[in-house]
Every structure is written in C-alpha cells, then in structure tokens.
Amino acid sequence: MSTPKIMFYHDGRHPLIYRYEPPMQPEEYEQGVDELLGTPVEAIMFCLGDGRTVLHDTEVGELWGHNRKKWPHLIFRRAHQNASGLIRKGHDPLRMICDRAHQYGKLVYPTLLLQQGRGSWDEDVRCSDFRFENPQLEIGARGDLPEGYPGSTCLDFKHREVRDERFELIAETLRKYPVDGFELQMNYQPYYFHPDEIDAGRQIMTDWIRKVHRALKRSGRKRELAIRIPSSIEGCYEVGMDIKAWLKEGLVDVLIGQTFSGPELLDSTVDFSPLV
C-alpha cells in the first residue's frame, strides 16, 4: 500500500462501541471500517480507548473497566461489556479493525492518547490501576503547583516507570497486530513535566520518541510514526516537546497539528503554517 494522503481519525468510542447495546456483534464493530468505504480515506487512525486503559485484548496494559463493579454512567459500562464480550468470544476488537481495513485496501494507524490526568476512584471509571496506585508519578506529586494547574495529575515523564509503561503498550501493539503505523496523540493533555523541569524534560522526551521510532521501524520498515501536537512549535517547546529536534533527526513521519488543548479542541481556523 502506498503512503496515505487522506487520514481519518476514528475515535472508536463515541461513534462505535458506545452506540451498540451489549452484546456487540463482530459485524457491528466492523462498522468502524465499513462506514468509510466509498470515501477517499486511505488510512484510519483508530483510537485504542481511553489511553490509560484500552479496548482490545492487551496483555501488558489494562482493559477498560476491568477494575469496576459499579459504574456512574451507562455508556462507560457499555464500552466495557462490548469489548470484554467480543474478546471472550475470540474477537479481538483491534485485530478486527485491522483485518477489515486491509480487506478493503485501507491502512490502520492505532492512536494512543498518550497523556491525561486522573480523577477520583468513584468517578474516573476509565482509569487504570497503574494510575490509581502510583500518584507519586504525577506532575503535581510534590504538592507545589498552583491550585487548578491543568497538568497536576498527569504522568511526569521524568520517571522511567512512566516512560516504560507507555512504551510497552506501544511495543505490544506493534508486535501483536498487523498495523501500518502508529499515532501518538500528544495534544490530548499536553503536559509532560513539572513546570520547573521542562528544560531537562525536553531531552528525556526526545530520547523516548527516538525509542518509539526505532521500535516501530524495527517492527516494519514501512511503518510510519505519526504524532499529533499543538500547532505552535513554541508552545510545544514550552511543555517539553522539541519538535524541531525530532524532525531534524527524522523521528517523525507524519506531523499533525491541532489547537493547544486539554483535552482536545478542534479549530478549523487555526494557523498551521508554522508546521509547514
């Protein structure tokens, strides 16, 4: 398959697994691909789930809702029931998307929401045990950030445990599934280091991106690394992402800009010219 020119982000949740009453059938899940047939879309950027937890048959990560018996919202419970039900019957959701897309000549780039914060146990039912059990790995762990700082409960990438946990989920996906590339959504909540440690953090993040890129290319030479970032190069630099260094070293194959946000905010009028 040739390098795609039109790539479509499929959330996998709101337009798919949230919409069907359990038990979801394989044919229903395949609608994630079928609804794009007849369109010029060449590659599907398919979201792996919440990011802290996922909606496929992972062995190194955590399945969405595996740690829950009570749910504050029907939709979140439905996602767990549908994903776990498909997996129990031998239908891995991510593999189904890959196989269906390839059947019709479309590429698949799984999308990992790399970063987001953590809420309370009672309400944040999509969160992983890893997050709940390791608050010391969060950016605000020292307790010295202003009240309301948006990245205080996000993971601090200065910690090797954080980088390893994120990387292992990516590596498993590259190893286990017939994907054509991988997307890091780094603009979902773009906070990766304590504000006082951004300068040191840039090199840490560049080293980690290099590790991901190498793993991807070793798993398949033609596989591409796509990275979604805030559209401001300066804004990225200020939160620890040295985009110019990544590009100079050839660590990124596809660069996707969005409005600086947390979580996502789409603005079709934003100036993307700095990325060109």
Language-model-derived ranges and their functions:
Residues V41-I87, Y191-P195, G257, L266-F272:
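Aromatic-lined carbohydrate-binding/catalytic grooves of carbohydrate-active enzymes
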Residues R19-Y20, L55-V60, L113, G119-V125, ...:
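Short, solvent-exposed loop/turn and secondary-structure capping segments
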Residues E27-E59, E172-F182, L251-G257:
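Catalytic domains of carbohydrate-active enzymes, especially glycoside hydrolases
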Residues G12-L16, D50-T53, L114-R118, Y188-Y191, ...:
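Solvent-exposed loop/turn segments at secondary-structure junctions
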Residues T3-Y9, A43-M45, G105-T111, S152, ...:
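Structural preference for beta-strand elements that scaffold enzyme active sites
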Residues E161-V276:
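Active-site neighborhood of glycoside hydrolase catalytic domains
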Residues V33-D34, L94-C98, I243, T269-S273:
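Short amphipathic alpha-helical segments and helix-helix/interface helices
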Residues S2-E27, N67-D99, Q103-Y104, P110-E172, ...:
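Active-site-adjacent "subsite" loops/lids of carbohydrate-active enzymes
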